């Protein structure tokens, strides 16, 4: 693999048994710090889910150590080359589950999961009739980018997906169901849950959107927008053939791919907005959030009460 940039971002997961997640997390954090990696890794009894960044040498050492651990035999690393770190710190945290579905009867992907489709097969399947493409990510991820024709479930987070499926059973019954997510981890469980619910033809995009975008054959075709990632990059390109912007500015509806968090820490909603609108609307998604005494934009820019009042007046006048 020809390396052109000094840093790498690794994205990976594996469903495998980790007997003591708390102990493993503490030891793994120490190991990652010794390599000077930065990132976010979740550990549970059911496995590991991580993204981390470091130099080529640091990431090579990390991958070698993981590959030499029998628990992670066969682990696949998705690699992006970057100019610098994608994280500020290193976190390794134990969790009850790797992805938050909170099912009463959990799914073990080693026992039940949907069919794996490689990018080319997924591409062909998307073009077939009687196919339903379900985005298994959060709403703000979909809004930044998605496959053409994909359904956006009316949910805010992944754990709400099973309820949405049950509510829309009549629409989905008898259809070929395709599911996809960023790297594949959410679909391992979600597709398994669909199979358990009685859906007969369920497939998942093997390796997720990230793998699809790197595939030399499909080159990300049929994807619109960008792919949301959980690090400081926020978004990465997928479609190598054309770039269609699907994101819309929260305030004006104009094409936009720039995410910020609402300045009210009690809200913290992710909103797409231009730099101009961020300043105009004090980076707040609503009037209620703009007038919050804890508005981070106001604090960060040391705005006076008069300046805030003038900004609010300008917004009101523009309605």
Swiss-Prot record:
The active site is at residue 181. InterPro entries: Rhodanese-like_dom (IPR001763), Rhodanese-like_dom_sf (IPR036873), Rhodanese_C (IPR022111), TrhO (IPR020936), TRHO_N (IPR040503). Keywords: Oxidoreductase, tRNA processing. It holds the Pfam family Rhodanese. It catalyses: uridine(34) in tRNA + AH2 + O2 = 5-hydroxyuridine(34) in tRNA + A + H2O. The keyword DNA damage does not apply. CDD domains: RHOD_YceA. One of its GO terms (molecular function) is oxidoreductase activity, acting on paired donors, with incorporation or reduction of molecular oxygen. Residues 127-221 form the Rhodanese domain. Its EC number is 1.14.-.-. The keyword Cytoplasm does not apply. GO terms for biological process: tRNA modification. Belongs to the TrhO family. Catalyzes oxygen-dependent 5-hydroxyuridine (ho5U) modification at position 34 in tRNAs. HAMAP family: TrhO. This is tRNA uridine(34) hydroxylase. It comes from Bacillus cereus (strain G9842).
